[in-house]
A protein has these predicted regions:
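Bacterial N-terminal signal peptides that target proteins for export
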Residues: 2-14
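Bacterial N-terminal signal peptides
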Residues: 11-23
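His/Asp/Glu-enriched short active-site or ligand-binding loop at hydrolase and phosphoryl-transfer sites
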Residues: 83-86, 213-235, 255-258, 287-288
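Proline-aspartate-enriched helix->loop->beta-strand connector
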Residues: 99, 103-120, 137, 240-258
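Basic- and aromatic-lined ligand-binding clefts that recognize polyanionic substrates
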Residues: 58-70, 166-219, 226, 234, ...
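A short, structured surface patch at a secondary-structure boundary
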Residues: 58-110, 114-123, 224
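Flexible loop/hinge segments that line or gate small-molecule binding clefts
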Residues: 85-87, 122, 129-156, 160
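Structured C-terminal subdomain patch of bacterial secreted/periplasmic proteins
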Residues: 34-36, 58, 147-159, 168, ...
Length: 335
């Protein structure tokens, strides 16, 4: 690579990163709404138009949620590569690993017919994406930010993989389970009020339309941070210690997501200066939950709903709730 090419590469990459960092206003997931047109045309979040004449058979997934959903639809051999951060399902860990930070030649060598990315890759690594497309590889960029988008996203994955019926089944099963979970707490006269922490050291929560808050509310919880302002292009929201403490007596349960972006402990939250005035802290009602089951657009959101429900209303989330969860998660291809 010549010096000129190197400079061009870094200029393009920097431009993409700056666009990511300084973009404001609409959430990443809805900056350019993806959609299905007709029975086989897809418009992704970058505005690409893909007409699907036949299912893709050699797919590389560069986001864990894409990978998980493809496996859930019944794919396996069709998935020839995954990202570096896969954790679920176990079969994903047996696949070849790829990264958008690597030389595109590694991708070209295995001849994928589709690479599924998300918007941050589109914006931050445009030269990588362009190289794939110039070599005839289809690229599609998807990342839903709310539940309604998630349903469309699942249907798109079904069209791409030839698993449309399984995708529709995923949607109907998920909706049915959500309805059944909600019915478990209908009789609760006093619903639990919850502060749901997204990032502890920044005192951030989730936007009201995020998947995490959807999981909380489906389990019968009341989000006390409905006035939280979104951080640019994400489902994370500013809140701040002052506002948390101003509502300290209202917080029955303090819930925190745990994972790569947040590593809270009960001790850390308890010892946060000022937090001992929070009702949930005084009552020892502090809990953590895996971010992958409350923030990712997969069927495992039902696990998140179930776990939150067992925290808030253990008397209501009993054997019946486990039946709801297990029924929804039966393999789609068993029907």
């Amino acid at each position: 690579m010549t010096n000129k090419q190197i400079n061009t590469f870094f200029s393009l990459s920097l431009a993409g990163i700056l666009a990511l960092v300084f973009s404001t206003g609409i959430k990443e997931s809805t900056a350019a709404a993806f959609r299905i047109e007709g029975h086989n045309m897809i418009v992704d979040q970058a505005g690409r138009i893909l007409t699907i004449d036949k299912p893709f058979k050699r797919i590389i997934s560069l986001y864990g949620a894409h990978t998980e959903n493809l496996f859930n639809l019944g794919l396996d051999n069709e998935i020839i590569g995954v990202s570096r951060h896969e954790t679920y399902p176990p079969q994903a860990l047996q696949k070849s690993v790829f990264s958008y930070r690597e030389d595109p030649e590694k991708f070209l060598a295995v001849r994928p017919d589709l690479v599924i990315i998300r918007p941050m890759i589109d914006r931050g690594y445009p030269q990588f994406v362009s190289m794939l497309e110039k070599n005839g590889i289809k690229v599609i960029s998807l990342q839903p930010g709310n539940i309604e988008d998630m349903y469309t996203y699942w249907e798109i994955l079904g069209i791409l993989s030839g698993k449309q019926q399984q995708a529709l089944k995923m949607v109907s099963r998920f909706k049915a389970a959500v309805s059944d979970f909600k019915s478990l707490t209908d009789a609760q006269a006093a619903k639990k009020r919850v502060y749901f922490e997204a990032i502890h050291n920044k005192m951030k929560t989730f936007t009201p339309d995020s998947m995490a808050i959807f999981a909380l509310e489906t389990a019968g919880g009341i989000n006390i941070a409905t006035d939280a302002e979104p951080v640019r292009n994400t489902n994370i929201a500013y809140y701040g210690k002052e506002r948390i403490l101003s509502r300290s007596r209202e917080i029955d349960v303090y819930l925190a997501q745990s994972g790569a972006m947040n590593k809270p402990t009960v001790k850390l939250i308890t010892n946060e200066p000022g937090f001992k005035t929070i009702k949930a802290v005084a009552d020892r009602q502090i809990y953590t939950i895996d971010e992958q089951i409350v923030s990712r657009p997969t069927m495992r959101l039902l696990d998140g709903i179930y776990q939150i429900g067992t925290i808030l209303y253990p008397e209501d989330f009993n054997e019946k709730s486990l039946e709801i969860l297990n029924g929804a998660k039966n393999p789609l291809w068993n029907e």
